[in-house]
Amino acid sequence: MSDNILEIFATSYMWLLEHMFLINVVFSFLIIFFQRKNPTTVWAWLLLLYFIPILGFLLYMILGQNFRKERMFKMKEIEGEIKYAVRRQEESIYRKKLRLRDPELERFKSLILYNLNEGEAVLTDNNDIRIYTDGREKFNALLNEMDHARNYIHIQYYIIRSDELWKEIEEVLLRKARQGVEIRILFDSMGCRGRKGMHKADWDRLRKAGIQVAEFFPAVLGKLQLRVNYRNHRKIAVIDGRIGFVGGFNVGREYLGKDRKFGYWRDTHICIEGSAVTSLAVRFVLDWNYAAGENLFLEDRLFALPEYVRGGKDPVQIISSGPDSSSQEIRDNYLRLIHMAQRSIYIQTPYFVPDEGLMTALK
């Protein structure tokens, strides 16, 4: 019996070696012609396939695939007033009827129109913006706004640590849930894993309290992640459709500057009060619908702007991009802004891996 197994294995191995060249050619054609990638990326994958046959293609299937064509979140789900607002604003721009309060924004009309066409991003100019660069200040503001929630709280983070900061947030969420406030938490499967991350017992405790929880891209087998480069890094909080938070701070003690390894954590988060919050509400619902298998677009109350919104005069256009986008709206916005620069360009980022297009624009 064992001799037969060894013979089958040897035969299969020899067949694989004999056909290795043909298999690599087929895989190479798949990489070149079935995925749109820049030449540098294509060459990198082809070299990997050449030096590590077959295994290289398996790595490509896990790390290199472009899932954009799958349209995971399908923007066509956005109906009603949002679609109408996009079309109406496009007409205003085409007919030069759009009046911007800030004359400086006149030269950005082409960019505004691009964002409308590509990302259905409506421009609103009745917003009040607050900027936070300190984690403690940001989370104090978030906790305060959640404590004043009347109808719903939606929060979405890539990383949530089960530590003292989360305990502060959880305490408010549990209290608001008892008061009848509808609460949804969306977390990324990979970002919340690990020894310091959230565990099943943590989520179960929230669910028992009536809080809805959804996991983005859950692991297939235990900790196996097949889409490691398609994580949800968004950090969004929307309260009553009235106020929204978006930016770079995740939930963890290190973001408060309490981790010796990282020291003081400098990041940027903004708080929006005004009509632009609707765009954040839509973005959350798109991600939630995909992760939870629901259709919250049927619930108009999640997108209605409350009468008690204070608002302001700041113009805002929320640009959203990711594996669900057919084009790279955020990247293209940076490129266009760089090309439009007249005096100076300042870039501040912890992750600077410019592609060919960005390097050409900077030159």
Model-derived regions, located:
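Helical hairpin unit composed of two closely spaced alpha helices linked by a short loop
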Residues: 350-363
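N-terminal localization/anchoring segments of enzymes in phospholipid and broader phosphate metabolism
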Residues: 1-336, 340
